[in-house]
Amino acid sequence: MGPLTFMDVAIEFCLEEWQCLDIAQQNLYRNVMLENYRNLVFLGIAVSKPDLITCLEQEKEPWEPMRRHEMVAKPPVMCSHFTQDFWPEQHIKDPFQKATLRRYKNCEHKNVHLKKDHKSVDECKVHRGGYNGFNQCLPATQSKIFLFDKCVKAFHKFSNSNRHKISHTEKKLFKCKECGKSFCMLPHLAQHKIIHTRVNFCKCEKCGKAFNCPSIITKHKRINTGEKPYTCEECGKVFNWSSRLTTHKKNYTRYKLYKCEECGKAFNKSSILTTHKIIRTGEKFYKCKECAKAFNQSSNLTEHKKIHPGEKPYKCEECGKAFNWPSTLTKHKRIHTGEKPYTCEECGKAFNQFSNLTTHKRIHTAEKFYKCTECGEAFSRSSNLTKHKKIHTEKKPYKCEECGKAFKWSSKLTEHKLTHTGEKPYKCEECGKAFNWPSTLTKHNRIHTGEKPYKCEVCGKAFNQFSNLTTHKRIHTAEKPYKCEECGKAFSRSSNLTKHKKIHIEKKPYKCEECGKAFKWSSKLTEHKITHTGEKPYKCEECGKAFNHFSILTKHKRIHTGEKPYKCEECGKAFTQSSNLTTHKKIHTGEKFYKCEECGKAFTQSSNLTTHKKIHTGGKPYKCEECGKAFNQFSTLTKHKIIHTEEKPYKCEECGKAFKWSSTLTKHKIIHTGEKPYKCEECGKAFKLSSTLSTHKIIHTGEKPYKCEKCGKAFNRSSNLIEHKKIHTGEQPYKCEECGKAFNYSSHLNTHKRIHTKEQPYKCKECGKAFNQYSNLTTHNKIHTGEKLYKPEDVTVILTTPQTFSNIK
């Protein structure tokens, strides 16, 4: 065995091979080669400095020394001497030799032959010194003459072919003592050891990342600064590394001879075109012997094989997670550091992986290479096309062994399996809530942090999920991509379309086992079940009131805090619920989408239309168990029940008067404040209640939509019509328990009761006199003001017969 030389431990790359390496791999190669040379010099083995080392020290491309030899070669022709030593062209059978000759078929020189004894293109020794146009043979440096029978790969040097043979034997004799990883070649082990031994002495001041070479940190700093000093003279494109510019120039000037017939995309290598075609067709030639999974590229199969032995030597120091590849660990670390080195030049968005940036760029270019043969729809990713194809086949290959449910995608099956195990490994440190997926936990954490990274460019509104931003954007564009095939109605969300479809089929698949009531949606059934159990797990810490839903508790808390987060941009009025704001906005727009088919009356809310329809049908499904009285609304029945209990939970702090309903208390408080916030635009008259203003407005329009079928008399309010009808029926449902007197209206009964109780709640501020009716107080106040709207005889009538006054009013 001869003495060890640098070329015994060196690895050489041709231009094509060098371009396949990424920046990190190229830098690692430079560092290893330079270190190997320094070690040989230290041992006194290396004598002269190889061209490769000189090239690497000057930060030039390592394939340049090889290129110099290529430059001197000219197209070969047949040698005029020693013709008998060369094979005739028609007798050449070796595929690589034929390929070598084909490279020069466009030359003017013909009859290029190969030397017999070498079975390869060789140099003619006789004419080494005297070249002329027709007396040259192809030099050995111009071809790859060493062939390997397993993969028909060719090499410039015999030593390189021997190294390549080792990769096919699958023997990995060189083992790392640190992590146990094995390699088939000693230089590869030497490269690997650097990961464990080398000290990162060069640190970036910006992000704190450390490097083992000053040249690498110089390049890294350009990521932070955004500096791109290398400009292409042809197209003006700039780069942060010279190697990137060199690669770009090759691709810019190089002929792309290999064109895809399907999509028209061109490539400078036939091998890349072949790989591209395989991706388009979906063929997967490379199959795993362990699990039978197939791949369209051999490199993907090689990566996949590492899953089976379970070897994961690269461990994250932050979270302890282990990986098969150092590159995967590097990508993973960016999750902890938040580093996003790959920035889009169009919009400035940054990514932690180069592949994500490549995919993102297609948004700007609108490139969609992957087309569905069934419907013609195109996609920017092959994975999206694969998913899409399952729509046409309706095939669901992924089946759950527990319940037999099938899915189109393996990811959905994995999600489904967790429903059986109940496993929730990802826990929130703030509130302790657990989740099935880390992505769901990440989204949940934003509730605590308040982070909203997704911002609308039109109105500036921010969201904590990208899907919410996408849905929100449709408000500005008015896009409604989800259309109902039955009635043509369109929706901005697929979930809304799914709900809408149930209107047409009238199917209610979710049935309550307790009472048999059926529902269209599972969420409604869940809500309904609580009515049977009476469970109210969500309790208010302020007042102790309990609720059966967390959302209702959240809304309730706003009563105590006074928070009204939903504000109207038109008038500034604020609301505690977004639904109330939506309803309120219709006042300004005048929108009334919900129209009654019977009488043509329109409403701003569907619930109001549903209630209104019961007037025509006469349906009163809600019946009081105490007195048998029926109502067309459940809320009206609830209010009615309080009459029987005499419970008055809502008390006025000013005068101590109690009320059955909070709305009545609110109205009552206005008596004390004297506030009249609702003003008529026609005559300027102000009112305490919005309902009173609405009734007043009808005076100006003269509209009386409510007509009595018996006598034809019309009214401007439905309540007045109901009261009027009692004249015809003679009905007096409201009876006094003290004296037995009956009344048509509950208000008359309440006024009458004050005769027995002697209650006089309406007091004059001037003289202190009290009255049992508000109208009497109003009449009395005119004595102090001197106002005389009525003649003395009229006043006498009013005072002696309050019922008559009531009728006049």
Swiss-Prot record:
T- and B-cell lines. SMART domains: KRAB, ZnF_C2H2. The keyword Transcription regulation applies. It is found in: Nucleus. Pfam families: KRAB (PF01352), zf-C2H2 (PF00096), zf-C2H2_6 (PF13912). GO terms for cellular component: nucleus. Keywords: DNA-binding, Metal-binding, Nucleus, Repeat, Transcription, Transcription regulation, Zinc, Zinc-finger. The keyword Ribonucleoprotein does not apply. Residues 7-75 form the KRAB domain. A zinc finger (C2H2-type) spans 174-196, 202-224, 230-252, 258-280, 286-308, 314-336, 342-364, 370-392, 398-420, 426-448, 454-476, 482-504, 510-532, 538-560, 566-588, 594-616, 622-644, 650-672, 678-700, 706-728, 734-756, 762-784. Its main location: nucleus. One of its GO terms (biological process) is regulation of transcription by RNA polymerase II. InterPro entries: C2H2-ZF_domain, KRAB, KRAB_dom_sf, Znf_C2H2_sf, Znf_C2H2_type. One of its GO terms (molecular function) is zinc ion binding. Belongs to the krueppel C2H2-type zinc-finger protein family. May be involved in transcriptional regulation. This is Zinc finger protein 43. It comes from Homo sapiens.
